[in-house]
Amino acid sequence: MSEAEPRETEAVTQPEPAPEIHKPDIVPPRNQINKKLLATQVQGTVKWFNVRNGYGFINRNDSKEDVFVHQTAIKKNNPRKFLRSVGDGETVEFDVVEGEKGAEAANVTGPGGVPVKGSRFAPNRRRFRRQFYRPRADTAGESGGEGVSPEQMSEGEKGEETSPQQRPQRRRPPPFFYRRRFRRGPRPNNQQNQGAEVTDQSENKDPAAPTSEALASGDGQQRPPPRRFQQRFRRPFRPRPPPPQTPEGGDGEAKAEGEPQRQRNRPYVQRRRRQQPPTVQGESKAEPSEHPASEEGTPSDAPTDDGAPVETSEAGVEDTTAPE
């Protein structure tokens, strides 16, 4: 019984053979499935090729026969082109196979097996993607140290050198074109030099404006609102009054031109008030000089050529003759 038990265990422990996994065969190109080969290494000239649709025709040099070509039949494409294509009038080398509707080209290459040139309408590959990420890599290398790889540096040295330099990198100024187009005011690089100018302007114009200390305490990019600087250049439109017609002539115009624009309205109003009544005041002054003398009887003494006063009113004569 003891001998039979190990045999049973051995039979049980023997692993069963794993079933064989059949890997799918590599599918040949579409134009080469069950197709009969008619000719090899035939040269021809591309008659036309549509890049968008991906097919065209090649004219054989030996038999002058047109052979259909699909973009999947191109074996060696131009490495600079994004899509497979052949250019119009290009000389190519290919194999001829029998298709469903006639002869088709396969394994299309350039003469001698070189890559084809491709169509000029085919898009080129984008080769300069890495340039956008290079500045970040350069800054990381500068922060880590000059001429020292990050592997050679210890963890303590990395923490000491990278920690103080990573903080200012987070507050980088925006690009030049963005700063020039969308933002106005002092640039972040010249904040120290222009701090005094901002404080002087704020004290003279707006006492409630933030000072240089308030700007320094906040972010480096904090600036006063742009409207404050635009108000002094934009003023409401006011129609200018017509120039007054004064007897003085060019003197009044010269004075008006010499004064600033903001003070043109006030002198004009005062000048207008003074200039309107002269004709009326001349008549009114002459009339009161006659009527009060006749009505009230007040003497009006006027100097003569000899310097002695002359009594012009009749009331004055009566007063002098009354005592006699």
UniProtKB/Swiss-Prot annotation:
It is found in: Cytoplasm. PROSITE patterns: CSD_1, CSD_2. GO terms for cellular component: cytoplasm; nucleus; ribonucleoprotein complex. SMART domains: CSP (SM00357). Phosphorylation activates in vitro RNA binding. It comes from the Eukaryota. Putative translation regulator. May be involved in the developmental translational regulation of maternal mRNAs. This is Y-box-binding protein 2-B. The lineage of its organism: Eukaryota, Metazoa, Chordata, Craniata, Vertebrata. The gene is ybx2-b.
